[in-house]
Amino acid sequence: MSVVSTTPASQDACYISLLGLAEYFRTSQPPNIKKCIQCLQALFTFQPPSKVEARTHLQMGQVLMAYTCNIDLARRHLEQAWSIAEPLMNFDDVKFDTASLLAQLHLKTEQSSHAKAMLRRAVELSQNNVYWHCKLLLQLSQIHASDREYSLASDLLAVGAESAEEAGATYLKVLFLLSRAMILMIERKTNDVLALLNSAGQIIDNNIPNPHQKEYLKVFFLVLQVCYYLALGQVKTVKPSLKQLQMSIQTIMAPNWPSDETIFGGNQLEMFVWLPKEQLYVLVYLVTVSHSMMAGYMDKAQKYTEKALTQIEKLKQQEDKSILSVFKVILLEHIVMCRMVMGNRELAIREIAAARDVCLAVPHRNLLKRHSAQLHCLIGLYSMSTSFFEHAERQFLVCVNETTERDLKLFANLNLAIIYLRTKREADLKQILDAVSTENTHTYSSQALMGGFYYVQGLHAFHKNSFHEAKRFLRETLKMANAEDLNRLTSCSLVLLSHVFLSIGNSKESMNMVTPAMQLASKIPDIHVQLWGSAILKDLHRMSKDAQHEKEAYANHVKYSENLIADQRKCVQSAHHELINWFQGNPPVTSNSSLNPAVTVPTTETSTSALQQPQQPAAQFGQFY
């Protein structure tokens, strides 16, 4: 009878052979995961040393997580790996890799408290290993941020910045500073954000010797700076930063630029990347779309959205990263608002449906949870623009109740105010205007939204025939809009001011207001202002007995109205129109046989936000998107 040798040398040979076989089966085309797992499982029959056993359990967990749906078995192997590795010295890679993977697994099963507890313990144990300490701090702060525990996330990032500084890792310190600035921006801690951005900016300029890392950090810094200004509605102020950002991303995307692996692979403490350059490229498109939309350049916003969506589809074919779905939803949310400004509401509801599909495709409905309030708000705008006011009101109320974002709440409330104005609900209107005024008096909100608030008050005063009060509010709106080149707000204010002057018989001032309003509206283009302005022009030309110009203005007004009616007909016939009845839970799945929603071609067809007869311009109100 032969005896199997159990000498250390022969055991090592068995381990190496089995690991080699496991890797062979894993990398086969197609992978043979069953045999890979069998090879790894066979290692345990040799009663390997603790470190080999822990590493093998980790490998089993990695394979099961990556290639199977057997979450429970993956968890058991990772928990065994952790229980063996936790007390062992000089075994950091296996120990902390296991902790990191276990946290990811807990998140997959929606147990974020377990993930946080696991990472907190790992952070505590990793204090003598700067690389793992910082990596685990970033992972833990990300989970807290996802759970909207922003103060905890910010504190962890501050600890990371200190750890990086103590280790002399300047690049890593700046990453922590910028990440913390991003969290503080979400918390609307304006002064703290500015202080952090200034501090990080000085380090980037003076203390990052590697030019490629410097350019990369500059892109991160400029993205945050642009987002900071846009969040405050400072569309004009942001222009130099946005231009600089666009130039920096072109530098990084140039063919001769080194790969991310080359730039960040030389030093362990530099192996941290906020986003790979291909994703940064999409992000720069996204902030450019946001700027174009806020500035009132709808054609530009459409053009950049289509380019960004094309780039996202290319990246998804290479590797379908979850952040690409986030980018896609945000882009669709922006383009939906552009479509409605231009009067293409049937296209808008298609793209709302496309955003819904992206959200529903993400596991555990995580993306839907984060964007449900925005979708309700968009459907509210669509319902409002197609004169389904009861549906619009309910959608905005759902949005207000679901969201924790102050600006989104203000945005929805302003549109609710317009609905109450249209439907002559004076008590509800007063209540909402008082609430908005109280909530935003002592806080620094977006200049665009506060300008919108003054506009709604001006509109309210106009409908009470308080023309002096209306002029006062609208001049305040114009002052804010002109200061930051908020073209759409400017055109809306001018056309309403024109109507105020028309109502008090001052035709000269009315003409002085409506002329630039129409010029801006055609540049945007904003069908709502064009419809309203053409009606005012028709009346002004009739008063001055200019029959030719009166006829032209009337023809334009009829054209806008007919486009509106045609688009309205398409809207109510669309299967996606059913979304106006979604008020809770998962949105209904709707489909149109002719639908190609992802990347859509701009259309020149226009309509307006409410069905109006050409003879009734006074009922036109507009919306705030």
From Swiss-Prot:
Domain of life: Eukaryota
Compositionally biased spans, kind Low complexity: 612-625
Gene3D superfamilies linked: Tetratricopeptide repeat domain
Location of the region described as Disordered in the Swiss-Prot/TrEMBL record: 600-625
Assembly information from the UniProt record: Interacts with Nipped-B to form the cohesin loading complex.
Described function: Required for association of the cohesin complex with chromatin during interphase. Plays a role in sister chromatid cohesion and normal progression through prometaphase.
Entry similarity comment: Belongs to the SCC4/mau-2 family.
Name the UniProt record assigns to this protein: MAU2 chromatid cohesion factor homolog
